[in-house]
Amino acid sequence: QEPVNLNVATREQLEQFPFLSDIQIEHLLAYIYIHGQMKTIYELQLVEEMDRQTIQYLLPFVCIKAINNEPAFRWKSLLKSAAKYGKNELLTRFDIPFYRRKGYEHTYLGPSVYNSVKYSFRYSDRLYAGVVAEKDAGEPFGALHNRYGYDYYSFYLLLKDCGRLKALAIGNYRLSFGQGLVISTDYLMGKTIYASSFNNRSGGIKKHSSTDEYNYFRGVAATVSLAKDWDMSGFYSHRSLDGVITDGAITSIYKTGLHRSQKEADKKNLFTMQLTGGNVSYQHNRIRLGITGIYYLFNRPYEPELTGYSKYNLHGNNFYNLGIDYAYRWHRFSFQGETAIGKQGWASLNRLQYSPVQNTQIMLIHRFYSYNYWAMFAHSFGEGSTTQNEQGYYIGMETSPFAYWKFFASFDLFSFPWKKYRVNKPSRGTDGLLQATFTPRSHLSMYLKYRYKRKERDWTGSKGTLTLPIFHHQLRYRLNYSLGDVLSSRTTLDYNHSHSQDRAANIGYQVTQIEAPG
């Protein structure tokens, strides 16, 4: 609804698109700087490193408009324009099962209907506001522990680019700085088939408008421009969390947000957490530096059971993390990374990207997350779900040597220095991926992907005395076809093969067909 005008787009706006590499962004900004305003969207074909498929991905989100000298920012003008041109949207979702599920016969306290309501207001890319309400299937509505109606409510207000005030969030918001080793509530794409998607950009402050009941902060956050190349961010959050309290201490944190049964409802909002911190960043031409620090504490001590694989997990009452992130671009090379410390341990992630020729990228990533690094809100690249107890080397290559074709290959070698769930000793593994994508038309595309993974796991029934390698082979073919705005079709064929040493293999097949209005 509000495409980005490329003639005035900033680096931060372009970095929101995961399919754009740092080099492509650099060449796009340089093209406009050298040649002046674009007259038509088709000029994207003249930008160095901009391939056909990337342009196709970009077209729905951008536009070309002539610009004049903009007047200085005025709050009165912003509010007046927002009242006149702002857009309102109301969305609701109902999920009604056509059969009686087992859990609703005795266990769950509410009906099997899921319902969410989202109201949002938006003006340009400067003002966002909204309210979210949600009731999961099985949760009561307007009764018992939900006497005020829904089980979850969320409010957010976000202002952006208001003079020196680059961002202001009130209510629920999300944060991401550096490579995510200190704090990141962004959704990562994982080991995807686009090398450009691994470019963790400093996302800063964002609104929280989803129904995720755990992965957000509640309070206030702001980013201010101190000088031309300097920004400073500060934030504070105070919110209740779900969990289990035993003898006055928190023994587990409950992250699902489900309160369907009495047992789940008894865990709701049992303790509070406060968090404060900040970030200072410097960016000039090809260099970017930043420092991020956070401090958070619970109103009760957090004392989970620390045995076996969880021996070095987070515990205590108050915690901190401090990290330095850095990035530098030189010709066809791009280097970025972050190194962080906590109350225990340290972590570091560094990546080097090289584009030897147009439409080809090579990515190298090294990460080291010590087994005793505590970072409750960190979220970064890795095989595991946390930035703890992992180290590895990753290499990926993406190239488009022919028209309509794109090839991707990657290999990841990783290890876990300490025990993990269902692995009673230090372990290691590998992960390889090959993919070929063919896009002959804008409405027709297909790909073939093969993935191989080897990981170690305790054999069932061995009580941790026998650890065997598990081999996974996955093959997928997918065809996407659309008839304009009328119909979109997706056909997927999946084959999975899994086996361990001297054990029988598990084999599975699946055919999926999805038809939806365009």
Q: Where do the protein language model's features map onto the residues?
A:
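Outer-membrane beta-barrel proteins
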Residues: 134-152, 206-213, 266-269, 340-342, ...
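Compositionally biased linear targeting/interaction segments
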Residues: 1-141, 145-158, 163, 172-176
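Short loop/turn motifs that connect adjacent beta-strands in outer-membrane beta-barrel proteins
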Residues: 80-87, 126, 162-168, 177, ...
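Exposed, low-structure sequence patches enriched in small/polar residues
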Residues: 108-112, 271-304, 311-518
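Aromatic- and glycine-enriched pocket-lining scaffold segments that form the walls
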Residues: 214-262, 269-281
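Extracellular/periplasm-exposed beta-strand and loop segments of Gram-negative cell-envelope proteins
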Residues: 204-212, 247, 262-270, 275-277, ...
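Outer membrane beta-barrel
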Residues: 147-242, 359-376
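Solvent-exposed loop segments that connect transmembrane elements
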Residues: 143-145, 194-197, 252, 303-313, ...
